[in-house]
């Protein structure tokens, strides 16, 4: 199985769906969802996160380039066939995208301003 073909995105759709899974519908509490000591519940939640974020990526890719869009299947059966190494790799990839796509433009602009200010101060 080539897990590198499974892509993830954090879109408004993904955030809404993920929030529904989280305690009190708060997406910033996703860590609580995924730290459940019950392994069955924890892996079920992880699959749901992967499924939602992959679906979000697919929706976005289809919207961005409908003529060249080629869907990539991701199913519960595929998830259950992952090795521990693949699961760890996929988890890292999903949460890298979760963090990256969750940043706001305001935060990005603020960083640019800080860098610009630091550069000007050092001159």
Language model: regions and residue ranges:
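Alpha-helix C-capping/helix-to-loop hinge sites
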Residues: 37, 53-60
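Short N-terminal mixed-charge amphipathic segments
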Residues: 1-46, 123
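Charged interaction scaffolds used for protein-protein
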Residues: 24-38, 62-123
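A contiguous, well-structured "functional interface" segment within a domain
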Residues: 1, 49, 111
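Short, hydrophobic/amphipathic alpha-helical patches that form generic packing surfaces
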Residues: 44-56, 92-96
């Amino acid at each position: 199985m080539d897990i590198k073909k499974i892509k993830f995105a954090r879109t408004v759709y993904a955030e809404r769906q993920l929030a529904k899974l989280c305690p009190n519908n708060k997406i910033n509490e996703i860590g609580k969802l995924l730290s459940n000591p019950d392994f069955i519940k924890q892996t079920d939640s992880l699959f749901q996160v992967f499924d939602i974020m992959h679906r979000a990526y697919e929706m976005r890719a289809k919207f961005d380039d409908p003529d060249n869009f080629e869907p990539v299947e991701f199913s519960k059966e595929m998830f259950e066939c992952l090795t521990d190494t693949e699961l760890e790799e996929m988890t890292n990839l999903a949460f890298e995208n979760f963090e990256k796509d969750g940043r706001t433009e305001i935060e990005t602009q603020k960083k640019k301003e800080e860098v610009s200010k630091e550069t000007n101060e050092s001159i």
